[in-house]
Amino acid sequence: MPPKKHDEPERKPLIGRIGTNLRIGIVGVPNVGKSTFFNVLTQSAAPAENFPFCTIKPNESRVPVPDERFDYLVEYHKPASVVPAYLNVVDIAGLVKGAAEGQGLGNDFLSHISACDAIFHLCRAFEDPDVTHVEGEVDPVRDLEIISEELRLKDEENLLKNLDKLEKVVARGGDKKLKPEYDSMLKIKDILIDQKRHLRFEDWNAHDIEALNKYLFLTSKPVIYLVNLSDKDFIRKKNKWLPKIKEWIDKNDPGALLIPFSGAFEHQLTEKDELERKAYETETKCKSMLEKIVVTGYKGLQLEYFFTAGPDEVKAWTIQKGTKAPQAAGRIHTDFEKGFIMAEVMHFEDFKAEGSEANAKAAGKYRQQGRNYTVEDGDIIFFKFNAGAGLKDAKKK
């Protein structure tokens, strides 16, 4: 039967953990600037954005996600409470060649990557006699190969161990419900072992994605490539390694994002006050790349947010892409999801263009949506729900 006019096409499930408290890990070989990057990211966040900053663990922090739409709502409502969206970032100790076989505490570090949901793959493209390189000389393309292969080898070990168990059950005519998983694992084996490729590039079906999500393979995680330049190269926008790194990424991870930055440049910015920062950025004709990195990392986790906004609070509520209105309401309170009646929605752009909620309503830009509505990034939403005693207005004051 053809779908109804207003039905949405069926969405494939997302690869990765389901949830909103997802983490992105900083991965690379030793001495490429991971901790420097982590420190400037966390140090710059609170002072620059005037948001509360929280260190979860010594090597894990959450950083506010910058957004001009959020800033506009804060300026418009001047609320008592301000809560942005956050990106959880983990600094993972350096991986060395042979990590998948346990070299250099490799298994511990690889398990830390497994606990993350996406990867900032950081490589070093600067010379510094005071910072030795674990492989003796700087070669970011070689470093990319090392990390890429160590992740694949760890997945190979994980796959073969679990495939062997499945094979024994399926071959004996055991649990027939495991046959689709077994078939998916054979497809994964072909890509990972026979073709020696990472898993995130394939067009997997829903059964395959179930298997990928069950075993949380490292090479199925989204990767964003960060290239750490010297401040001199960053300012002059030239580095001999960048074309070679881009060539490697285009060949081995087509479509992946590459963001050059300079830990040294960012560190200098953290030591300046706001006026000095602006003057230095004007002088060098360069800006901090941290905002771009944070936003890219957040989107790489398949996350987005909707806003609730009023004089008491402006808040960005993190959801996964494709979330329906009742589940989005449940982010605020479980009662909102259980008793969901409708969502009253304005797109941010409509609110800004019309100048107020009343004007948006008058212009027909304030819409009532039912439980099949898929929330869009940047929606301003007021939920109506039934809490048993009658209609309640879940509008943020």
From Swiss-Prot:
Binding, ATP: 31-36, 229
CC per GO annotation: cytoplasm
GO-annotated molecular function: ATP binding; ATP hydrolysis activity; GTP binding; metal ion binding; ribosomal large subunit binding
Presence of keyword Phosphoprotein: yes
Positions bearing Phosphothreonine: 132
Principal localisation: cytoplasm
Named cofactor requirement(s): Mg(2+)
HAMAP family linked: YchF_OLA1_ATPase
Subunit-structure text: Monomer.
Homology family: Belongs to the TRAFAC class OBG-HflX-like GTPase superfamily. OBG GTPase family. YchF/OLA1 subfamily.
Protein name as it appears in the record: Obg-like ATPase 1
Classification lineage: Eukaryota, Metazoa, Ecdysozoa, Arthropoda, Hexapoda
